């Protein structure tokens, strides 16, 4: 019996030692935990993962293959002051909040319209751009479509979950139209250009940069005088994130030293820059 107990004790000790020694050492390259502070999380990781969709003039690739845009340069300037690298990740706009909550991205920095509904789940910075929704049609239809009443029987498109979609649903006339959502605002322009849609409701910032003479959409125009929802852009972080306040602080510095003015002038956005 004693011999059996001795053998059992040796076996237990051996198993305990094996279990302890088999544990892998901590990986020093693993991301820093962020149970409390997103600011500490981002600084600790040495990067800010920024969610975006292709949206000229905010985030896009130019003819030289360089990733540029107002929001792109703004984000780089903020990250430089934070001492971290910006990492831009293209996302599906419809799942942006899911990506944020899952920490696949640290923020949405992409012409993100501030709304009361979104504020319930998103921590926004103070506004930095004043924008509006406009309607783009083929130039040949400029006399046919002049106001929301004339568009009430048209085939409309807008980016899903966008301010453009909201403007359609909230307008008495536009809500009667034949509406189909698209994945991206640029998809809406393609639909109108190809003739599968009569009009697209989208951000003025994008429309003014991509439509008209000298662009790929030279045959499209913005309906003159038809301004829909007026809105403001903010950078979206996880609800309760301390990064929003820090970015506000840095933005104030960038306004003071003229950086924001320089970026806005470069992308012809000086008139809608909010300080």
Residue ranges and their predicted role:
Residues 80-81, 89-90, 94-107, 121-123, ...:
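Short helices/loops that flank or line small-molecule/ion binding pockets
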Residues 1-45, 272-275:
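Short, low-complexity disordered leader/linker segments with a strong preference
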Residues 61-64, 75-84, 163-183, 211-216:
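Ligand-binding cleft/hinge of the Venus flytrap
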Residues 95, 112-120, 167-170, 193-194, ...:
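A ligand-binding cleft/hinge motif common to bilobed small-molecule-binding domains
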Residues 27-111:
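Extracytoplasmic small-molecule ligand-binding "clamshell" domains
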Residues 134-143, 230-246, 250:
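A bilobed periplasmic-binding-protein/Venus flytrap-type ligand-binding module shared by bacterial periplasmic
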Residues 138-156:
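Flexible hinge/capping segments at coil-to-helix
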Residues 31-33, 163-180, 218-219, 223-224, ...:
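Ligand-binding clefts/hinges and TM-proximal coupling segments of bilobed small-molecule sensing domains
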């Amino acid at each position: 019996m004693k011999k059996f107990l001795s053998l059992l004790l040796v076996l237990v000790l051996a198993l305990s030692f094996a279990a302890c020694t088999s544990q892998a050492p901590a990986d020093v390259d693993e991301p820093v935990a962020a149970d409390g502070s997103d600011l500490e999380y981002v600084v600790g990781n040495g990067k800010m993962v920024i969610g975006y969709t292709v949206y000229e003039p905010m985030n896009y690739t130019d003819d030289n293959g360089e990733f540029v845009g107002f929001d792109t340069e703004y984000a780089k300037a903020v990250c430089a002051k934070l001492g971290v690298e910006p990492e831009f990740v293209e996302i599906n706009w419809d799942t942006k909040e899911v990506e944020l909550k899952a920490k696949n991205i640290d923020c949405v920095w992409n012409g993100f319209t501030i709304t009361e509904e979104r504020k319930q789940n998103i921590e926004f910075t103070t506004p930095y751009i004043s924008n509006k929704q406009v309607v783009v049609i083929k130039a040949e239809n400029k006399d046919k479509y002049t106001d929301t009443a004339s568009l009430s029987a048209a085939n409309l498109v807008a980016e899903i979950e966008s301010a453009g979609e909201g403007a359609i649903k909230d307008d008495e006339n536009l809500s009667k139209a034949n509406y189909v959502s698209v994945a991206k605002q640029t998809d809406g322009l393609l639909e109108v250009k190809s003739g599968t849609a009569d009009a697209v409701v989208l951000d003025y910032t994008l429309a003014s940069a991509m439509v008209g003479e000298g662009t790929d959409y030279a045959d499209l125009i913005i309906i003159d005088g038809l301004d829909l929802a007026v809105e403001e852009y903010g950078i979206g972080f996880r609800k309760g994130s301390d990064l929003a306040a820090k970015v506000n602080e840095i933005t104030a510095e960038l306004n003071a030293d003229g950086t924001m003015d320089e970026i806005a002038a470069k992308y012809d956005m000086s008139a809608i820059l909010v300080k």
